[in-house]
Amino acid sequence: MIAAALPSFSATAEDPRTKLVLAALKLFSDKGFEGASTREIADAAGANISAIRYYFGDKAGLYRAAFSEPLGDQPAQACAEIDPNQPLDQALQAFFAAFLAPLKRGEEVRMVMKLHFREMIEPTGAWTEVIDSEIRPQHDMLVHMLARRFDAPPDDLEVKRLAVSVVGMAVHYFVGHQVVNVLAPQLIANPEAIDLLATRLAFYAAAMIDAEGARRRAEGLWR
């Protein structure tokens, strides 16, 4: 599956709401939630400070928008459309293609990752919402696929260990975005490279799943 570059969030930057989100993303990622004032954000966006209340309710609402909206359609939404009962190789390809799609947004991803790292150090509670709305649905879908593969219950700890390991391959391209850009920038240089990356990660994940199957057979846990 070859996909074109996703339109960047800033492509709609003439919209006043989008201008506020982009200004907030930059300032929150640079200064943190406490360090960036609503006045400063409004000035950077060329907006009246009252627009923050109008569009987002308050500073916390603006922070939540900056935390996730620039990534575009949430990967969790795309993953929800994947049929976990289809052949495993097809499901894995669809999963990684959806998961990696935000990388096609370029610089905005770098700023979002910077903000996410800052959130880990200076927590505001935004991660709790992200886990519930984005990460948990992805994890549950992958666990369902793997549990079905091994005729195992969804609370099987080894299935969960494998699911976390599989998705960890893709997560690195987000949290290690700057590192990858230094060590091997060609891997995420353009939409075609990202599509190829999704295909390769699906291939690697299938090998990991086969290895887990071999372990289960050797221990008499699966036929």
Could you say what each language-model-derived stretch is?
Residues 107-132, 177-183:
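Amphipathic alpha-helical segments used for helix-helix packing
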Residues 2, 128-136, 145-202, 214-221:
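Hydrophobic/aromatic-rich alpha-helical bundle segments in the mid-to-C-terminal region
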Residues 16, 20-28, 99, 205:
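Short hydrophobic clusters on alpha-helical segments that form packing/core surfaces
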Residues 14-22, 55-79, 128, 132:
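An amphipathic alpha-helix adjacent to DNA-recognition modules
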